[in-house]
């Protein structure tokens, strides 16, 4: 058994801007497990800075090498792994990178695709697009291009002071599209009056307007809005999802497997959303074709009832590290049919983008 890593620096096709910064590259750790003729892959959704959450590439590598990889070497099944690493507080993205590595391994060991190993897939994922902040005219052009390609939901990034202009322009030009907005926790409880102005734009939901770890203020804001709230950063466990619905803090949850600690916790959150008759979708973190394959598989599950941020690979990368990138047809993407996550790695581009590599365990 061997666990290795590649740290990659992959240039994005265009800069991606949110309320907390602009990405021009995707800096990512890709992990590989080799055992008994099976090769499994995963990646970490962190980057170089702890701006989305508290983890970054440096913390993930430390936690994986010192604590998680030794557990993975025992080849526990994913649920067993989650139980065995409970003693480690937080560090969900590190945990997810190893849990999902085990999911790929065991799906392949059982000669099943990941979706068949998990179960309850409808066979396709409905696709939405997330657009970073940009010049208004550029954004309008990107929206038209996305609609022409068949995307089923448009999401625009906003921040305090730059929300009314973009939302007004989008609604003036596209009055009937399925539209959402994501603030990435840029507002505070002092901004309720400003946020309430967003109601006029008929959004399907407003995503994470307040603090990244908050439920209480979101529950208060929800009472003032007709627009449903979607929580992203705040939902780091099934327990927090339960509390959020009980307190009325949201009607929608954006699931990111990395943020929740892996597929197991993500499935639990789906069950909670279903119990409360809410809505749920699969988000994205500018993943490579490896992480994107996990996302598409999850987004195809029958309990997912909103389009997710599961764009084809060419949305972000000119050349991905997989030879079989996803393509979209009529606003849907089908999971890979091969065993596990079903990706074929391009050794050419893996080598081209690698800035560091080595053995972890």
Which ranges hold each PLM region?
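Conserved, mostly hydrophobic/aromatic
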Residues: 31, 37, 98, 111, ...
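Metal- or metallocofactor-binding catalytic centers and their adjacent structured scaffolds
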Residues: 5, 34, 39-109
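Predominant activation on well-ordered alpha-helical scaffold segments within soluble catalytic domains
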Residues: 65-69, 99-104, 168-171, 196, ...
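Metal-dependent enolase-superfamily TIM-barrel catalytic cores that perform enediolate-based chemistry
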Residues: 116-225
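Hydrophobic faces of well-ordered beta-strands that scaffold small-molecule active sites
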Residues: 42, 125-131, 152-156, 179-183, ...
């Amino acid at each position: 058994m061997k666990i290795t890593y590649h740290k990659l620096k992959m240039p994005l096709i265009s800069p991606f801007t949110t309320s907390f910064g602009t990405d021009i590259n995707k800096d990512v750790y890709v992990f590989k497990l080799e055992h008994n003729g099976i090769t499994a892959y995963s990646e970490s959704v962190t980057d170089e800075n702890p701006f989305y959450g508290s983890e970054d590439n440096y913390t993930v590598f430390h936690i994986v090498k010192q604590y998680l990889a030794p557990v993975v070497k025992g080849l526990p099944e994913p649920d067993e792994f989650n139980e065995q690493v409970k003693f480690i507080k937080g560090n969900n993205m590190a945990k997810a990178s190893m849990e999902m590595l085990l999911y790929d391994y065991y799906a392949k060991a059982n000669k099943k695709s990941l979706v068949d190993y998990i179960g309850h897939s409808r066979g396709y994922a409905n696709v939405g697009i997330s657009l970073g902040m940009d010049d208004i005219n550029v954004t309008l052009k990107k929206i038209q291009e996305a609609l022409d390609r068949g995307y089923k939901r448009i999401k625009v990034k906003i921040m305090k002071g730059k929300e009314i202009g973009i939302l007004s322009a989008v609604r003036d030009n596209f009055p009937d599209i399925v539209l959402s907005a994501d603030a990435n926790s840029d507002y505070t409880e002092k901004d309720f009056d400003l946020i309430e102005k967003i109601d006029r734009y008929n959004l399907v939901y407003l995503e994470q307007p307040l603090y990244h770890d908050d439920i209480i203020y979101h529950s208060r804001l929800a009472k003032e809005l007709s627009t449903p709230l979607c929580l992203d950063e705040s939902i780091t466990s099934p327990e927090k999802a339960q509390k959020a619905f009980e307190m009325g803090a949201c009607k929608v949850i954006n699931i990111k497997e990395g943020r929740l600690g892996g597929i197991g916790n993500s499935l639990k959150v789906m069950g909670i959303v279903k119990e409360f008759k809410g809505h749920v979708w699969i988000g994205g973190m500018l993943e490579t074709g490896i992480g994107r394959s996990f996302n598409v598989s999850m987004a195809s599950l029958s309990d997912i009832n909103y389009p997710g941020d599961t764009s084809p690979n060419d949305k972000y990368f000119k050349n991905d590290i997989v030879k079989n990138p996803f393509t979209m047809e009529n606003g849907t993407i089908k999971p890979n049919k091969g065993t596990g996550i079903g990706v074929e790695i391009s050794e050419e581009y893996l080598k081209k983008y690698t800035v560091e590599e080595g053995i972890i365990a």
